[in-house]
Design a protein with these regions (language model features):
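Gly/Pro/Ser/Thr-rich low-complexity, intrinsically disordered segments predominantly at protein N-termini
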Residues: 1-198
């Protein structure tokens, strides 16, 4: 009689992710599990977003930058375009559409050539794309909150809504007629939803 032994599933790390080929497949790691989504354009060896997604990414980043320009130094920084983030205490890397990292997080980065941000952003923003799966977005949102991100925005370009997630609070949805709640760690930052879509 033979006994089959079950092997534990592989726990993926950032090093594993960085060693993967650049083959047009979008990959990220959540809770040590590899997530993959084939590119809409496999002949292009990079993550490709539609122009509406890209425009919204810029608008959100510009809105944060406008607020940031009113703040005293030292200030944090704004990142966009699938920023790779190493969240402390989490297994793996996540890609974020737009993120604001405060001055403390920015100050501890190794150098400007680092491809990944190490630390917890103050605000993360996910912009839904037509090929995003709701469960993947919810999983990423939960991962951000567990890692200590204070506020997560999930923007739906089709409905022109923003869903705001905060640890310990139920998610809140805001439409084009609303002002977003002020971020607790970003005094005075409370843009209207309309500003993000104008």
């Amino acid at each position: 009689m033979s006994t089959a032994t079950a092997t534990a599933p592989k726990v993926w790390t950032t090093e594993d992710l960085l060693a993967m080929p650049d083959d047009g497949v979008e990959r990220w790691i959540i809770n040590g599990k590899l997530r993959e989504k084939p590119s809409e354009f496999p002949e292009v060896k990079m993550t490709v977003r539609n122009r509406h997604h890209c425009k919204l990414t810029i608008r959100v980043g510009a809105t944060i930058l406008s607020w940031l320009d009113t703040q005293q130094k030292p200030r944090g920084d704004v990142y966009g375009g699938e920023l790779g983030v190493l969240l402390p205490g989490r297994t793996g890397t996540v890609g974020i559409d737009v993120a604001y990292a405060n001055a403390g997080v920015v100050a501890v980065q190794d150098d400007d050539e680092t491809t990944l941000l190490a630390g917890v952003p103050t605000l993360t923003v996910e912009i839904l794309s037509p090929n995003d799966y709701q469960e993947q977005i919810h999983e990423k949102t939960r991962e951000y909150l567990r890692a200590g991100v204070a506020v997560v925005w999930v923007i739906d370009p089709d409905d022109q809504t923003v869903k705001v997630y905060r640890s310990g609070h139920p998610a809140e949805s805001f439409n084009i007629t609303h002002r977003l709640p002020e971020h607790p760690a970003m005094p005075g930052f409370a843009p209207t939803v309309a500003e993000l879509f104008e």
